[in-house]
Amino acid sequence: MYFDGYKDISILDITFDSGKAKGLSALLVRNRAFECVVVKDHALDIAHASFGGVGVSFISRNGLSYQKDTFPKSFEGGLLYTCGLDNVSNCVNGVYTHGTLHDTPAENVRYDVVDGTVYVSGYIATTGLFRHSLILHRKLCISCDGVTVIDRIENTRKVDADYCLLYHCNFGAPFLSDGGEVKVDYLTREGLTPLAKETQATASNIIFPIPNAEEVVYYHTVKDGRAEYVNRRLGIGVEITYDSDKLPYLLEWKSMAEDDYALGLESATTRFDTFRKTPINAKDTHEYIVNIKFNRFQVL
C-alpha cells in the first residue's frame, strides 16, 4: 500500500510462499532510508532491516521459519527478537529457550502513516488454562532512521503474576565488520563465560570473522540506558536507548564466528545467572520503550 503525499513510504502486506517460511505473514515497510520486515506471526518482531541500502540486521543461516524446531534450528536473529515472557536464555527448565513470546502470532494488527511515521500495532496474548494471562500490546513507530518500540504488558487476571523480558537486537554484515566498535558508557562490565572473562578488555572491538570462534556474552550496567555500535568505514551507526531503571541489564552477545557473525545488544529485566522475574500486580500494566535509531556520519 502506498500513501498519498508520501511517495517514499510504503507498506506491503505479504505472505511467504516457499521454503521453511511458507505461510508466515509479514509487513514489508519502507520509510525513505529505512526498510524492514515486521513479522506478524512472530509477535511483530523485526527480521530483515536495511538503512540507506545497507543491510544492518543479523539473519542466521536458519532464516525465517513458520514451524518451530529446537532453538538452534529455529533462531533467525533479526533486528528485533523479543525474549520472554516466560523465559530468557535457559533459565526456566522445560520452557523454550528465550521464551515463547517471539513465536506467538500478533492479533488485531493495524498499520497507518501519520506525519511521515509508519505505525504498526497489535497485541500478543500469552495465556494458559489455570495459569497467567499476560497481554503484550505493541506499537512500532517506524521512521526514516529506525524504529521505536512501545510495549505495554497487561495482567488481565485478578491475581498477581510475573514475567521476564529481553530485547534481543541483532546486527550483522555488512554493517557488522572488522574495525567496528561497541560504545557503552558502563558502570560495570562482566564476562559471562570463561572466555568472556578473559576478553573483557576487548569487548568493544569487532574483528574479522574467524572459523569456529566461540561466542561470548558480557553483562553491562549502564549509566544512561544507551548502547551504540558504529562502523566508521561505512559511516553508519546505531544507537539503542531505553529506560535503565526498568531494563537494568545490558547484554552484549558477540559471535565472531565466520558463519555466525553477529552482534547482539540486549536490554533486559534480569541477568541469566541471577535470574529473577518481574512481579506485576493483578490488573496492572507495565510499559517499556526501546528506540533503535540509525545515523550517518563522515566516512573515515
Would you name each region that the model predicts?
Residues 1-148, 159-164, 171-208, 220-300:
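Surface-exposed acidic/polar loop and edge beta-strand patches at domain peripheries
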Residues 212-216:
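C-terminal beta-strand-rich structural cap/linker in extracellular carbohydrate-active enzymes
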